């Protein structure tokens, strides 16, 4: 009994630490997957960024069965597609989960993409970059004082439509 009392706290701490580590790796994978799905949505809904009927910026291509232009100047539809792909992240609609969409020139230097949403050019052969950040809260933080930390995921793809 004494041996159990001495070893049990260390054993359970180690056990739950391994579980938390696995959970954090899983969340990182889900963030990368969500960013990739958002970028995939953006690349197949590309088109000229400046068209009559759109104020400015990127928008999905007009569906073949519709005559209306579907504008997405702030990337809200890409953000929605990204959040929908984050199925394993429980609070993906909260402030802990943020998505940034950048449309940039395909010049090999996406780090210099200007502005909040890039340069607004979502034409063919331009790039779209989707960055996802999530504030991870360990489950054992109630027992052991562990801080939250920020995880990131991202995907950069070339627009082909």
Predicted segments with their positions:
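Amphipathic heptad-repeat coiled-coil/leucine-zipper-like oligomerization helices
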Residues: 93-99, 116, 126-134
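Disulfide-bonded cysteine motifs in exported proteins
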Residues: 65-66, 99, 107-108
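Short secondary-structure junctions
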Residues: 86-97, 140
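Extracytoplasmic
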Residues: 123-127, 152
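Short, P/G- and charge-enriched loop/turn segments at secondary-structure junctions
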Residues: 112-122, 140-143
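Alpha-helical assembly-interface signal, strongest on the long, hydrophobic N-terminal helix that forms
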Residues: 1-81
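Low-complexity, S/T/G/P-rich flexible repeat/linker segments used as non-globular hinges
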Residues: 49-50, 131-161
